[in-house]
Amino acid sequence: NYLISKKLVKQFYTPYSCSEETLKRAHSENYIKHIKNKTLDQNTIKKIGFPLVDSVVRRSLVATGGTVLASKLAINYGIACNTAGGSHHANFEGGAGYCVFNDVAVATHYLLDRGLAGRILIVDLDVHQGNGSADIFKNNKNVFTFSMHSKTNYPVKKSISDLDVE
């Protein structure tokens, strides 16, 4: 691999499918069940923007597992990333904006629940506001959500992050 041969990275890791137990801290059991069974209502499927098929469900579970894995690796090695992550529009009750599960929220809860971190800063520099992350952590004093985004972009109705820069 080019990145390894140039010593830009030491190793690549293969993500795993995120467990239902881990997902439940950031998403409702009902929503998770409907995603896994592919029985989600058409309105929520439309909000997500993807058809609810096996490949989308699998990709969403593995991408979320990848962010949890990257968060653990970052704790151990000081830095790690998951290039398939960043699904910041999904909230507790459902997905939106091409985001099925909020992988950053899932990984944040994972680290906090296991005492691997005491406080977490979520820095979201996407052109779209991280509304799902803001909603999930709006009452959590151990998580600070910072979103720098376009004021006139999706989502039309913005959530309130701890700090929004438009």
Each language-model region and where it sits:
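HDAC/HDAC-like amidohydrolase catalytic core signature
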Residues: 1-166
